[in-house]
Amino acid sequence: MFKRIFLLTLTNIAVIFLLTLFISLLHLDRWLNAYGIDYQTLFLFSMVVGFTGSFISLAISKWMAKMAYNIHVIQEPSNEAERWLVETVAELAKRANIRMPEVGIYESPEVNAFATGPSRSNALVAVSTGILSQMNKKQIAGVLAHEITHINNGDMVTMTLLQGVVNTFVVFLSRIIGFFVDRLFSRNEERESIGIGFYLGMFISEIVLGLLASIIVAWYSRMREFRADAGGAHLAGKEAMISALKKLKQIMEGESAFIDERSPALNAFKINGRPGGILALLATHPPLDERIKALERIPD
């Protein structure tokens, strides 16, 4: 976790340097200063706003998941199915060389599972009753291995940091655009104060930039799913992972296809997401056919 935070901090420093250089080369700093805009302070403000919400969400992610899905965390297995589930997660965590995550079950007809938590050593793997009833043990093991890989790769932290970075730029650029629009349409005597043009420009640009930011985050999420599939194949076996995805494909193409939307923020961390369709650029998961083909290309 700390390695990723360090790397993202370096990335932010590099971005700040390049942004400052870009503004200076285009002499935008003169224009910004002329209108009383301290862009360096604005950028720091944007970072605070951009990252605060992301880190709070990460810190309480396990609690949120438990509340949203009413997850039954298995402290002591009460039946054979729970015992097998806990033992399988423990074995996969051992193979991945990470601390045993909490294991839980949530009541839902969706065939899905997800991992969440603020770090590799403080995570939760939850499975639906739907997946337990519709998949065999080999397939479930593949799904669990996929989720363990998400934890091992630190995907929850990385996604949070990436979201914080794009949030920062959305906040920063939308306010710069707002200032520009306000000065463009205001009369000279009105330029000493912020007018309606600022708020209108900021609001519209936040929507547009937010959409572009979502496309970037979704693209990274799709790449992350391919890595989690490959890691799942390494931990549980390629055939188990392929079998699990083929079963998911069969279910999603049937009449019983269902995605539980009680906590949309967790959808990106599930084994399966809603198909992208026209909005494929915003899909957090690649098409199942592509994921299966990627696994089939892995050497035995």
UniProtKB/Swiss-Prot annotation:
Keywords: Cell inner membrane, Cell membrane, Hydrolase, Membrane, Metal-binding, Metalloprotease, Protease, Transmembrane, Transmembrane helix, Zinc. It is found in: Cell inner membrane. InterPro entries: HtpX_protease, Pept_M48_protease_HtpX, Peptidase_M48. GO terms for cellular component: plasma membrane. Its cofactor is Zn(2+). Pfam families: Peptidase_M48. Belongs to the peptidase M48B family. This is Protease HtpX homolog. It comes from Methylacidiphilum infernorum (isolate V4) (Methylokorus infernorum (strain V4)). The gene is htpX.
